[in-house]
A protein has these predicted regions:
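A short helix->loop->beta-strand "cap" motif at the edges of active sites that frequently abuts
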Residues: 29, 84, 89-93, 218-222, ...
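Cap/insert and terminal regions of metallo-dependent hydrolase folds
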Residues: 174-259
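Active-site neighborhood of divalent metal-dependent phosphoester bond hydrolases
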Residues: 81-82, 88-93, 98-124
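General small-molecule cofactor/ligand-binding pocket signal
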Residues: 4, 96, 123-128, 141-143, ...
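Active-site metal-binding motif and surrounding structural segment of the metallo-beta-lactamase
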Residues: 38-93, 187
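Catalytic core of the metallo-beta-lactamase
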Residues: 113, 126-184
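Conserved beta-strand hairpin/beta-sheet module of binuclear metal-dependent hydrolase folds
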Residues: 1-48, 151-170, 187
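Active-site neighborhood of phospho(di)ester-bond hydrolases with catalytic His/Asp-centered motifs
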Residues: 32-36, 53-63, 98, 166-172, ...
Length: 269
């Protein structure tokens, strides 16, 4: 399994950066995980957008889904998608988003008179906590995490043997449920948005130190910090996580590729 970082910024983009977006690939299967501001342009630097099998959205905040709009326009109007000038079988990727997404998409794009743009361009399916699905050679599971709108951590594993596991924590405050869901992950990607915890009200984000603590409790093999601004010192963030997690820690960078190897101990006998 291979994960490519297309965008790792929080709600405001880094200079020349993009918000949340990751390619998850195994064998011939290609899934785009989140599609925030700037991600569609970054996707085109790495892959043919028409070759994406499915898009998975962790939650309905703009920095995680807004570039579905240019993606949908490309799928609808690009010359290659027209029978007269392009393919006779235009691409229509699956789109998996949380329950209620269809209505929200319609309200967002309906503001300029194209309320069904996204559901026509994509094969839209809504999911909830505890759901499982298969996309090509990948198997996905979803678990609710604490954030300001319904948000789900996503686990990717091989549908063939389940041996390689990548867990994406999405946007989340501190969560015992997230720790349990990520137990034993080969690669755990957690947000590290804030230098210090929110002081008032509901928690919806982690600090680098909290990400490290969660990774240790989840017995993860490797930790990648993401959803982190270029205004936050990378070496400091890494050191904060390393205070609590003894495994390898990396701060996500656009263009970085992470391989998730099959662990022999997890292969079926």
């Amino acid at each position: 399994m291979r994960i490519t970082v297309l965008g790792k910024s929080p709600s405001w983009q880094d200079a020349d950066g993009a918000c949340s977006g990751y390619l998850v690939e195994e064998r011939e299967t290609c899934v785009l995980l989140d599609c925030g501001n700037g991600v569609f342009s970054k996707l085109r630097c790495f892959r043919d957008y028409a070759a994406v099998d499915a898009v998975v959205i962790s939650h309905m905040h703009a920095d995680h889904f807004l570039d579905l709009v240019p993606f949908a326009y490309a799928l609808t109007y690009a010359p290659r998608q027209q029978p007269a000038t392009g393919s006779h079988a235009p691409a229509r990727p699956a789109l998996h988003a949380p329950r209620g997404a269809r209505d929200l998409f319609r309200r967002v794009v309906g503001a300029w008179g194209s309320e069904d743009l996204i559901e026509k361009a994509f094969d839209l399916h809504e999911y909830g906590a505890g759901d499982e699905l298969a996309i090509g050679s990948l198997k996905l599971r979803f678990s609710r995490v604490p954030h300001f709108v319904p948000t789900h951590a996503v686990e990717f594993s091989s549908a063939l043997n389940g041996a390689a596991r990548f867990t994406f924590g999405a946007d989340s405050g501190p969560s015992d449920d997230l720790v349990r869901f990520a137990d034993g992950a080969d690669l755990l990607m957690l947000e590290a948005t804030l230098p210090t915890p929110e002081s008032d009200g509901e928690r919806g984000h982690l600090t680098p130190a909290e990400a490290g603590e969660h990774a240790t409790r989840a017995r993860a093999r490797r930790l990648v910090l993401t959803h982190i601004s270029d205004e936050l010192d990378e070496l400091w963030a890494k050191a904060e996580a390393e205070k609590f997690f003894r495994g390898p820690v990396t701060v996500a960078r656009e263009g970085a590729v992470y391989e998730v190897p099959v662990q022999a101990s997890r292969l079926p006998a």
